[in-house]
Amino acid sequence: MSRSTPLKKVRNIGIAAHIDAGKTTTSERILFFTGMSHKIGEVHDGAATMDWMEQEKERGITITSAATTCFWKDHQINLIDTPGHVDFTIEVERSMRVLDGAVAVFCSVGGVQPQSETVWRQANKYGVPRIVFVNKMDRIGANFYNVEDQIRNRLKANPVPLQIPIGAEDNFKGVIDLVTMKALVWEDDTKPTDYVEKEIPAELKEKAEEYRTKMIEAVSETSDELMEKYLGGEELSLEEIKTGIKAGCLSLSIVPMLCGTAFKNKGVQPLLDAVVAYLPAPDEVANIKGEYEDGTEVSVKSTDDGEFAGLAFKIMTDPFVGQLTFVRVYRGCLESGSYAYNSTKDKKERIGRLLKMHSNKREEIKVLYAGEIGAVVGLKDTLTGDTLASEKDKVILERMDFPDPVISVAVEPKTKADQEKMSIALNKLAQEDPSFRVSTDEESGQTIISGMGELHLEIIVDRMLREFKVEAEVGQPQVAYRETIRKTVEQEYKYAKQSGGRGQYGHVFLRLEPLEPGSGYEFVNDIKGGVIPKEYIPAVDKGVQEALQNGVLAGYPVEDVKVTVYDGSYHEVDSSEMAFKLAASMGFKEGARKAGAVILEPMMKVEVETPEDYMGDVIGDLNKRRGQVNSMDERGGNKIITAFCPLAEMFGYSTDLRSQTQGRATYSMEFDHYDEVPKNVADEIIKKRNG
């Protein structure tokens, strides 16, 4: 069976945006204009086709990235919906891995907002080419040129408008296409229609010329050939301009900008044309890196030939077909009814049915080809980030990094009978979302759930009720504290026991040194002359690692330490791995007590947007919460306050902020780094922990 769409004509794109930039509406209109969904879902009524989970409908925010296939001008576009809320950055990271290009949607009034910066950073990290769509041009205060400045100054990118708006706010009529120098006008506001090409209005001729010159300059810098032609005063042909824009877009040296209003159906068709013209096909992006079990690196080229290799990037539970695993095929093809090899887990998986998803309908298919995205039904052991490959070529594609959770709460089912249902539900949800963890508190026996923020955990509890019919009581949020040391110390420890027959003997000298924040744990073997035989060294490492689980101050995990074993002794008969493990563990604990141990807490980057009248109250309140105000800006007549605040002080912040500002301020918060807790607060934490 051969493929219906050639690889060159496949586009895997995501629509990434800040929470209210109109991302879902833009996705909806794309699906509408590509002829897949006939009634446009409006987010305001909570009926968008992409937002297929109940809570999203209520909250009006998009949570899970669903992959949807649609067609435009004989190209297959796989649309991966990415969430716009900070607590779901893991979802964004995950979709960035499998995208080849992105459409960044900005609100023409709000411009570059904090979440847009986070999403932009992630797109830079994965080298994703993108085009910008400035949406909501019909809103009061719409300003295309402001957004252009913000992209340049805040995101440090090089925006190149390919269109400029005709009018703004209520007078927004359409756009001037700077490539063809034609005005594209939408004459009917109420229903989706095609645009009409007209001559450029006289009052905009000069501005259009100025912006076209800027565009041509940017394009000419993408190759020596075009530069020579441009400097020689020759006109660039239409084809050359388009090739130059694409080259600049793929090398991330330029970001093409378009504008419109998705809600009023203006500007969507030219956006689709730009996706097809300027965003990359799967074989136009860098090959994905992989490695074999022995560590040899390999580069995996996107092609139908060669052994199958794909990445499972998302797991969802579907009420009708059970568990769906979304897979992006990088090489070869995947057939339903065949077998694939999970090279991350070393397990064989049977491929059941294969589905191409439309946001809420599904089409059964026989084969997924290179560059395509689809869902597999019935995989047993495959989790997010696992590689599926052929048994003949067990490549492991580069793994995804998932952040550690920063907040935990205890959950208990309302009725004892629900205990088992609750653990099944939580395990299913943890499979879907690698940034969500479930554990049991050893002392109290309570079930603890941990995640990236309050909203993240609220939604988990909500999904337990809706999807699994388990009602849960939720405890007080707990912060994920850590411990570390501040001084370098050397510590000797001898573990020797003699109780009839064979004794136990382990003797180590350890050096404990503080590392830079975020470095984790480093172990160094500096034993000379075999004073400790090398078969015992792993036991020393293991002993230290066990001691790291419970710090000496309040029993929190210890991080950012380097431990060197540099001397010691052993006994021919009595030494054992166990003895060295215990010596290292106790030696580390003793050393840590002298090494200036401190408690660390997660610091959140908080951005509050508030009318000026309330600014004093907001800053005063942040200071009360031990926050450090970092910067103050203005945006659209409001004040923007950026601060670092300890997570421990931020519980219930949304309610407090609402009452301080009569509901007129908004905020966003994401984890930034760990920082030392002030002594008085640390004493309280220790007292509480140690009873």
Swiss-Prot record:
Principal cellular location given in the protein's record: cytoplasm
GO molecular function per UniProt: GTP binding; GTPase activity; translation elongation factor activity
Transmembrane segment boundaries: none
Family annotation (SUPFAM superfamilies): EF-G C-terminal domain-like, P-loop containing nucleoside triphosphate hydrolases, Ribosomal protein S5 domain 2-like, Translation proteins
Domain of life from the UniProt record: Bacteria
Keywords, comma-separated and alphabetical: Cytoplasm, Elongation factor, GTP-binding, Nucleotide-binding, Protein biosynthesis
GO biological process: ribosome disassembly
CDD domains: EF-G, EFG_III, EFG_mtEFG1_IV, EFG_mtEFG_C, EFG_mtEFG_II
GO terms for cellular component: cytoplasm
Functional summary from the UniProt entry: Catalyzes the GTP-dependent ribosomal translocation step during translation elongation. During this step, the ribosome changes from the pre-translocational (PRE) to the post-translocational (POST) state as the newly formed A-site-bound peptidyl-tRNA and P-site-bound deacylated tRNA move to the P and E sites, respectively. Catalyzes the coordinated movement of the two tRNA molecules, the mRNA and conformational changes in the ribosome.
UniProt protein name: Elongation factor G
Organism: Campylobacter jejuni subsp. jejuni serotype O:2 (strain ATCC 700819 / NCTC 11168)
